[in-house]
């Protein structure tokens, strides 16, 4: 279905066209009526400013590459908008011509913004003051875990509806080009707050954050010698799902942020990632290859890997040094770096990656050993079925056995160049006795992947997915545009406000990407950007007219 929305002109002021576009995006989220219903009270004075107007103003600021300050939103609603746009957004009264009128308008906008955040704030902690631990506990609102989870679900539904509204701008052809390839990554979103002080015992003015550490799963902790790891910033961690393209395929759609959730650094990265993927899938985006870094490889399988597979994603992952080699076994089959192999897989092939990282072998030998693993890999017979169970058979069975094995007489002829099992197991396991074995979904769930690790296909897929994800992170953090890494541009504290601002900035980044994509592909031109010309003369100058 066509989007029905026309992108406004590049930022250069809030025109009626941009205001209408921002209002249409908010309408497409379907969240403004939900917020109004949650804020409705049977008694008391009616709130004069609708939530839709404040949200549309923040969208306009994000599209303009301006900081989403409450003061800027007030100036836009009560000064920069035309009368027609104010009527469209339901802004009462006229422009705020005096300072007194502006302050009154500012109070209305600020009240409305905080009311919006209160509907979906999962944090009971007080903000904007550096408190002692005793005062922090005394001022913490009572909130049960069920209430916090419900508020978190409302918050994540809201911010993902903002991203979906920006994706809905794509036309039918652009949406159909997405084949399900997805990158998942967590990136720090620094907060406008200093961290807690170990010397004074005072809390952070935004206690919803945590120290972001570059290593591991980004939690604050000590290294193996008991020395605290270097803290990068006081931040929240944004888990972002990004649409991607197959490796080597010509660009057919822009790569956009499709899912988002924020949490403290290192706080249940697997569960947060699974919620993001579930949101993407629930909105109708097809699942496909899923690339992520080692922080997710180490997650609890029941929190991340199994939910991701249940949603239909096929993981493409890397491993830490302590995760290499044999990772699991089932029915005698060995799970070696993500794939199931014959139990007679030679030790040099099992230890190939560990030896490469230990500089015991070179890349040429390593590539040959990775290629040699293919003969020992179990053959897919059928599945996985709807329950996740898969039937795999011995590589020395079938009409075209890849191995010569004395336990499989049919594989002994012809005597060609196929690898030969020289030392079969003394007590053959089920994989050596049966035609096939059934692998349950939980066997080696943390490490299993469908592409042989370090194979050319794995390298191409993993590099493409990871580069796409890191590219989107850098794109959204560009100081000239969304500046996601600049906390001074996001001064309202709390996880609810930070999540809303992050979603608005990613929404604006998506719109900027769509606009750039269409500019590159307009008129049937190749969707490959050329570097700006620096030479004074070019052979292209002599092309004939027409």
Model-assigned labels for residue ranges:
Residues 1-70, 81-161, 528, 546:
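Dynamic "connector" segments at or just before major functional cores
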Residues 24-44, 216-220, 454, 482-490:
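Short amphipathic alpha-helical segments and their helix-coil junctions
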Residues 41-52, 228-231, 464, 490-500:
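Structural motif
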Residues 45-55, 75-78, 88-89, 107-294, ...:
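Polybasic low-complexity intrinsically disordered regions
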Residues 180-183, 188-193, 197-214, 220, ...:
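Long, low-complexity, polar/charged, intrinsically disordered or flexibly structured peripheral segments
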Residues 324-332:
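Short, charged, surface-exposed secondary-structure boundary motifs
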Residues 331-384, 390-393, 445-455, 459-491:
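Short amphipathic alpha-helical "interface-anchor" segments enriched in bulky aromatics
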Residues 461-545:
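Basic, amphipathic alpha-helical segments enriched in Lys/Arg and hydrophobic/aromatic residues
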């Amino acid at each position: 279905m066509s989007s029905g929305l026309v992108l406004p002109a590049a930022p250069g002021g809030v025109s009626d066209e941009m205001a209408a576009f921002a209002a249409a995006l908010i309408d497409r989220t379907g969240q403004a009526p939900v917020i109004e219903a949650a804020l409705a009270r049977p008694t008391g004075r009616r709130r004069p400013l609708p939530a839709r107007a404040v949200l549309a103003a923040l969208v306009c600021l994000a599209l303009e590459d301006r900081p989403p300050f409450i003061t800027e939103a007030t100036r836009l609603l009560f000064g920069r908008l035309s009368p027609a746009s104010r009527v469209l957004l339901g802004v009462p009264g006229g422009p705020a011509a005096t300072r007194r009128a502006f302050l009154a308008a500012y109070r209305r906008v600020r009240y409305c913004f905080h009311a919006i955040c209160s509907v979906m704030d999962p944090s009971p902690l007080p903000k904007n003051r550096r408190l002692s631990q005793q005062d922090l506990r005394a001022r913490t609102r009572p909130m049960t875990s069920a209430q916090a989870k419900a508020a978190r679900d409302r918050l994540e539904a809201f911010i993902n509806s903002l991203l979906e509204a920006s994706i809905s701008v794509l036309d039918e052809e652009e949406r159909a080009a997405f084949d399900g390839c997805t990158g998942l990554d967590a990136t720090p979103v620094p907060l406008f707050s200093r961290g807690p002080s170990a010397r004074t015992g005072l809390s952070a003015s935004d206690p919803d954050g945590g120290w972001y550490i570059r290593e591991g799963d980004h939690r604050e902790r000590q290294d193996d010698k008991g020395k605290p790891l270097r803290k990068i910033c006081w931040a929240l961690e944004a888990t972002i799902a990004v649409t991607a393209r197959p490796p080597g395929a010509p660009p057919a759609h822009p790569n956009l942020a499709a899912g988002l959730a924020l949490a403290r650094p290192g706080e249940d990265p697997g569960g947060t990632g699974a919620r993001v993927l579930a949101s993407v899938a629930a909105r109708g985006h097809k699942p496909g290859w899923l690339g992520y870094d080692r922080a997710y490889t180490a997650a609890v399988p029941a929190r991340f890997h199994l939910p991701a597979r249940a949603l239909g994603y096929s993981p493409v992952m890397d491993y830490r040094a302590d995760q290499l080699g044999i990772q699991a076994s089932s029915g005698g089959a060995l799970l070696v770096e993500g794939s199931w192999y014959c139990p007679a897989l030679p030790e040099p092939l099992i230890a190939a990656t560990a030896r490469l990282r230990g500089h015991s072998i070179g890349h040429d030998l390593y590539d040959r050993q990775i290629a040699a693993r293919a003969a020992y890999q179990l053959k897919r017979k059928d599945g996985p079925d709807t329950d996740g169970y898969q039937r795999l058979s011995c590589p020395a069975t079938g009409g075209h056995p890849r191995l010569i094995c004395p336990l499989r007489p049919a594989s002994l002829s012809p005597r060609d160049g196929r690898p030969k099992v020289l030392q079969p197991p003394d007590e053959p396991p089920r994989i050596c006795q049966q035609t096939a074995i059934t692998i349950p979904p939980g066997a080696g769930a943390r490490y299993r992947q469908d592409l042989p690790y370090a194979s050319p296909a794995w390298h191409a897929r993993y590099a493409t997915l990871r580069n796409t994800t890191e590219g989107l992170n850098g794109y959204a953090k560009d100081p000239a545009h969304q500046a996601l890494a600049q906390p001074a541009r996001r001064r309202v504290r709390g996880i609810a406000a930070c999540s809303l601002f992050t979603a608005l900035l990613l929404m604006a980044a998506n719109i900027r990407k769509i606009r750039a994509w269409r500019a590159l592909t307009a008129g049937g031109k190749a969707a490959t950007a050329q570097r700006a010309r620096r030479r004074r003369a070019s052979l292209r100058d002599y092309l004939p007219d027409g």
